[in-house]
Structure formats: C-alpha cells, structure tokens
C-alpha cells in the first residue's frame, strides 16, 4: 500500500471540517506533504466525483460528496489502493515442483481475499466517522 489512501482521507476530512474550498497548498501544509503530491491524489478524487476544483480567489478543492455517506472503501477505490500487494513472487510456474510452481498463485489468492476483507471493513466507515473520532479524542 502506498500513501495515497492516507493522503486522500486526510484531505477529505480537512475539506469536510472546513466547509469551504482549500488550495492544494493549504491541504499540503496540513497533511505535511508537497502540493504536487496532493494534486496527484486529488485528481483521483475529482474523477470519482468526490471533490470539484474551482478557479479564482477562493478557489481550490471543494468536497462535493456527502461526508456522512462517503465511505473509506469508496476513497480507496478512487485512488486505486491495494492494501495487500506483493510485486515479487517466489518460485517458478514452469517447474515440476508443486511448491515452487504453485506458491505464487496460492499467495495471490490470499492477497485478493485480504484486500476484499479490508474493502468490506472500510465500507462501514465514513469520512464523518473519521472526523468525529478526531474531535472526540481532542
């Protein structure tokens, strides 16, 4: 998993809490990253219809989705998050050994199941839930 999901949730909570448009610079300052990284992640959220951009003096990003119904699963999907992933596979499918030739397929199925479990869990948590948790523990 990369940091896109974390950044997206952070930005959406900021936008929800502020109730107004925020620039990529303002979001980056709160998230503690650079504006270019923010813009890259926000592009996925915009494409998914969660935010819109506005030009001008009070321009920036504005939350268009209802934070009370916007789930973390939807956010994860918008930024193409895979929670469990493995770029390297052990073994060799062309070998005669069952372990050597089958391990990658078995582990890939395990990773898919784990991602499905994560997505199911996140479908019950909204942006408002995260915002509420933050201010309950203040």
Where are these regions (language model features)?
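Key DNA-contact positions within bacterial/archaeal DNA-binding proteins
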Residues: 36
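Non-DNA-binding regulatory cores of transcription-related proteins
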Residues: 64-138
């Amino acid at each position: 998993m990369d940091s896109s999901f974390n950044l997206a949730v952070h930005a959406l909570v900021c936008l929800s809490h502020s109730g107004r448009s925020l620039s990529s610079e303002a979001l980056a300052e709160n998230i503690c990253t650079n504006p270019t990284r923010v813009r890259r992640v926000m592009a996925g959220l915009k494409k998914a219809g969660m935010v819109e951009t506005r030009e001008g003096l009070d321009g920036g990003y504005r939350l268009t989705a209802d934070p009370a119904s916007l789930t973390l699963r939807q956010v994860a999907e918008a930024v193409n998050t895979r929670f469990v992933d493995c770029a390297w596979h052990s073994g060799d499918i062309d070998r005669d050994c069952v372990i050597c030739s089958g391990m990658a397929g078995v582990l890939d199925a395990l990773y898919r199941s784990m991602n499905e479990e994560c997505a199911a869990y996140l479908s019950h948590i909204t942006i408002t839930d995260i915002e509420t948790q933050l201010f309950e523990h203040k």
